[in-house]
C-alpha cells in the first residue's frame, strides 16, 4: 500500500463519514425510507424479485398517503437497480425514499454507490429513517502492521491486519556464547562474536526492507512497525544505520517479550494492542507535531489559513495538506450581475449570514456554485500533487491546530514568500478601485 493508496483511502473514509452523518439526520413521514445493502456475489435478480413481492404487500397498506410513499420508494429502488446488470465487486449500497427537509417540505432522495472495500452485510429495511449501522464496518481500520521478533536464536517477520496474523518469514541463527576461557584468544573470540552479531543485525535489516517496502512504490507496505524480542537486539536494530530509514520512521513501539518465534509474535501483539488501537491518534499527533516543528523552527515551509493555503496549493508548493475533518466552510463561485465577472469566496456560517459578502461596489453577486470546501479539496488534491490528511480535534495537538490555525494548513516542499501573494492582491485591488 503506497502513500497514494493511503490518501485515496483517507478521502473515501471521510466521504463515508460525511454520508453517514447526513443519512442519520434524514427523517421521513411514515415508513417510506428504504435501506438496501447487497454484499459481493449477491444476485440483482434476487433483490428485484424481493422488491416485487414487497410492492405487492405494500399495496395493501390502508393509509393512502403512507401507501403511496412506500410504493414510490420501492419503485425508485427498482428503477435504480435496473442500472446494474450485476452486483459490483465490493457490493452495492442503496438508500432511497422521501425525506422531510428543514423547511418541512418533502424531497425525494436516492443514493447508490459501490463501497471502497467489500461490505459483508445483507440488509433490506423500510422505515422512517435510513439505517447506516452496517456502513460503520467500512470505517473499521484494515491497516496492516509489521512485526519483527528478534532474539539470540533467530528472527521472525510477521504482519497483523485486523485479527489476521501472518508469518512472512523466519530464520534461525547460531551466535557464539560468551567465553570464560581463552586467555590470549579471549579478544579474538569477543571480536568474532561481535562480527557475527553485526552480520545478524545486518541480515535482519536487509530482510526487513525486503518484506516491508513495496518495490513498486518504494514506500513501506505497512502502517506501522513493532520491534519485539528479548535482550537488546531489537534496540540495536532500531538504532542501527543498516536499518532502512523509511522503516525506522514507521516504528510505533519496541517491546520486551520473553520468547522468540511465534510465541513471541503472539506476546508482542498482545503487548501492543493499545498502541495499535490508537494508531490513527498517534499518526495524527506525529503529523501535527511535524507541522508545529516547521513553525517553531521558522523554516518558512508551512502555511495556514484558507486563502494562504489555497495560494500555496495553486503554486504546487504543498506537500501535505492538513484539514480538520469537520471544517465548516463553503466555497462559493459568485458572478457579478453587472460586469459578469466571477469571484471565488470561502465563507463560514457567520460570513454567509452577512449579505455584504454577496455584494461588490453595490452590485449583487449571484451564486453560481456552492460546495463544501472540504469536498472541493478532496476532489482536487490530486491535481495539486499533494497528500491530503484529515485530522480530528480530539488530540491536544489536533485541538490546537483547529483553534489556533483555523483547521486548514500545509507542510510545504520549499519555502514560499506568502507576502508576494498579498502584494499581487493589493495590485489587483488598486486596479479594481481605479
UniProtKB/Swiss-Prot annotation:
<comment type="subunit">
    <text>Heterodimer of two subunits, one of which binds GTP.</text>
</comment>
<dbReference type="InterPro" id="IPR005141">
    <property type="entry name" value="eRF1_2"/>
</dbReference>
<dbReference type="InterPro" id="IPR029064">
    <property type="entry name" value="Ribosomal_eL30-like_sf"/>
</dbReference>
<dbReference type="InterPro" id="IPR042226">
    <property type="entry name" value="eFR1_2_sf"/>
</dbReference>
<dbReference type="Pfam" id="PF03464">
    <property type="entry name" value="eRF1_2"/>
</dbReference>
<dbReference type="InterPro" id="IPR024049">
    <property type="entry name" value="eRF1_1_sf"/>
</dbReference>
<dbReference type="GO" id="GO:0005737">
    <property type="term" value="C:cytoplasm"/>
</dbReference>
<dbReference type="Pfam" id="PF03463">
    <property type="entry name" value="eRF1_1"/>
</dbReference>
<protein>
    <recommendedName>
        <fullName>Eukaryotic peptide chain release factor subunit 1-1</fullName>
    </recommendedName>
</protein>
<keyword id="KW-0963">Cytoplasm</keyword>
<keyword id="KW-0341">Growth regulation</keyword>
<dbReference type="GO" id="GO:0003747">
    <property type="term" value="F:translation release factor activity"/>
</dbReference>
<dbReference type="InterPro" id="IPR005142">
    <property type="entry name" value="eRF1_3"/>
</dbReference>
<dbReference type="InterPro" id="IPR004403">
    <property type="entry name" value="Peptide_chain-rel_eRF1/aRF1"/>
</dbReference>
<comment type="similarity">
    <text>Belongs to the eukaryotic release factor 1 family.</text>
</comment>
<comment type="function">
    <text>Directs the termination of nascent peptide synthesis (translation) in response to the termination codons UAA, UAG and UGA. Modulates plant growth and development.</text>
</comment>
<dbReference type="Pfam" id="PF03465">
    <property type="entry name" value="eRF1_3"/>
</dbReference>
<dbReference type="InterPro" id="IPR005140">
    <property type="entry name" value="eRF1_1_Pelota"/>
</dbReference>
<keyword id="KW-0648">Protein biosynthesis</keyword>
Amino acid at each position: 500500500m503506497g502513500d497514494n493508496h493511503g490518501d485515496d483511502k483517507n478521502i473515501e473514509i471521510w466521504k463515508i463519514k460525511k454520508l453517514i452523518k447526513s443519512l442519520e439526520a434524514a427523517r421521513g413521514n411514515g415508513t417510506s425510507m428504504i435501506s438496501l445493502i447487497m454484499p459481493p456475489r449477491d444476485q440483482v435478480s434476487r433483490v428485484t424479485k424481493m422488491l416485487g413481492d414487497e410492492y405487492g404487500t405494500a399495496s395493501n397498506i390502508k393509509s393512502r398517503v403512507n401507501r403511496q410513499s412506500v410504493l414510490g420508494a420501492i419503485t425508485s429502488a427498482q428503477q435504480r437497480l435496473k442500472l446494474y446488470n450485476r452486483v459490483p465487486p465490493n457490493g452495492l449500497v442503496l438508500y432511497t425514499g422521501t425525506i422531510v427537509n428543514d423547511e418541512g417540505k418533502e424531497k425525494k432522495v436516492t443514493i447508490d454507490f459501490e463501497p471502497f472495500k467489500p461490505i459483508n452485510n445483507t440488509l433490506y429495511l423500510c422505515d422512517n429513517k435510513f439505517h447506516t449501522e452496517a456502513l460503520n464496518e467500512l470505517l473499521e481500520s484494515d491497516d496492516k502492521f509489521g512485526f519483527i521478533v528478534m532474539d539470540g536464536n533467530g528472527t521472525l517477520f510477521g504482519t497483523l491486519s485486523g485479527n489476521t496474523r501472518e508469518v512472512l518469514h523466519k530464520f534461525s541463527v547460531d551466535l557464539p556464547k560468551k567465553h570464560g576461557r581463552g586467555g590470549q584468544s579471549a579478544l579474538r573470540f569477543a571480536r568474532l562474536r561481535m562480527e557475527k552479531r553485526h552480520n545478524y543485525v545486518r541480515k535482519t535489516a536487509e530482510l526487513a526492507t525486503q518484506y516491508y517496502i513495496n518495490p513498486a512504490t518504494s514506500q513501506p507496505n505497512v502502517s506501522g512497525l513493532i520491534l519485539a524480542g528479548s535482550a537488546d537486539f531489537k534496540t540495536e536494530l532500531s538504532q542501527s544505520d543498516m536499518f532502512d530509514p523509511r522503516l525506522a520512521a514507521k516504528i510505533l513501539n519496541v517491546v520486551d517479550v520473553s520468547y522468540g518465534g511465534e510465541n513471541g509474535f503472539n506476546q508482542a501483539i498482545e503487548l501492543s494492542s493499545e498502541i495499535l488501537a490508537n494508531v490513527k491518534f498517534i499518526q495524527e499527533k506525529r503529523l501535527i507535531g511535524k507541522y508545529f516543528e516547521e513553525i517553531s523552527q521558522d523554516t518558512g515551509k508551512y502555511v495556514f489559513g484558507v486563502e494562504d493555503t489555497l495560494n500555496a496549493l495553486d503554486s504546487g508548493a504543498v506537500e501535505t495538506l492538513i484539514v480538520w475533518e469537520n471544517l465548516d466552510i463553503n466555497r462559493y463561485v459568485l458572478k457579478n450581475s453587472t460586469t459578469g465577472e466571477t469571484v471565488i469566496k470561502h465563507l463560514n456560517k457567520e460570513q454567509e449570514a452577512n449579505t455584504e459578502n454577496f455584494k461588490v461596489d453595490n452590485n449583487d453577486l449571484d451564486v453560481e456554485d456552492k460546495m463544501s470546501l472540504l469536498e472541493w479539496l478532496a476532489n482536487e488534491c490530486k491535481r495539486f500533487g499533494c497528500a491530503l490528511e484529515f485530522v480530528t480535534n480530539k488530540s491536544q495537538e489536533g485541538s490546537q491546530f483547529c483553534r489556533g490555525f483555523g483547521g486548514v494548513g500545509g507542510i510545504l516542499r520549499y519555502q514560499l514568500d506568502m507576502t508576494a501573494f498579498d502584494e499581487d492582491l493589493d495590485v489587483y485591488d488598486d486596479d479594481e478601485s481605479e
